[in-house]
């Protein structure tokens, strides 16, 4: 499931739209490799705020394409003056939840 267990079966059309549009059109476009695309998505979700479930998903997406916690933390640090402390701290909490310190 793309958006978690809270999505009901009656919302299947939304799931289908997300799959076709976001995970089809945008991901399959050229110009950016998967690592850069995931870093940009992570950056945008971080700065939007209130997107922690999606942020967690794209933390995993970043790990899947070869970006590591150190790289993600560097992105968070770079965005601190633009996104602010609350969103930065939320992103760090998501990172630490997804990738514990001992990993």
Question: What do the PLM-derived regions correspond to, one by one?
Answer:
Residues 15-20:
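Short helix/strand-capping turn motifs
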Residues 34-39, 95-98:
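Membrane-interacting alpha-helical segments
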Residues 2-9:
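Short, small-residue-biased leader/transition segments that mark boundaries at the very start
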Residues 36-46, 55, 72-79:
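Short, structured motif recognition centered on aromatic/hydrophobic residues
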């Amino acid at each position: 499931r793309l958006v978690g267990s809270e999505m009901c079966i009656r919302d299947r059309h939304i799931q289908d739209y997300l799959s076709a549009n976001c995970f089809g059109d945008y991901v399959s476009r050229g110009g950016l490799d998967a690592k850069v695309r995931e870093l940009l998505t992570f950056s945008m979700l971080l700065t939007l705020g209130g997107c922690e479930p999606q942020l967690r998903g794209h933390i995993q997406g970043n790990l899947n394409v070869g970006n590591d916690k150190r790289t993600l933390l560097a992105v968070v640090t770079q965005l601190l003056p633009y996104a602010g402390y609350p969103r930065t701290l939320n992103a760090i909490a998501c990172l630490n939840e997804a990738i514990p310190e001992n990993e």
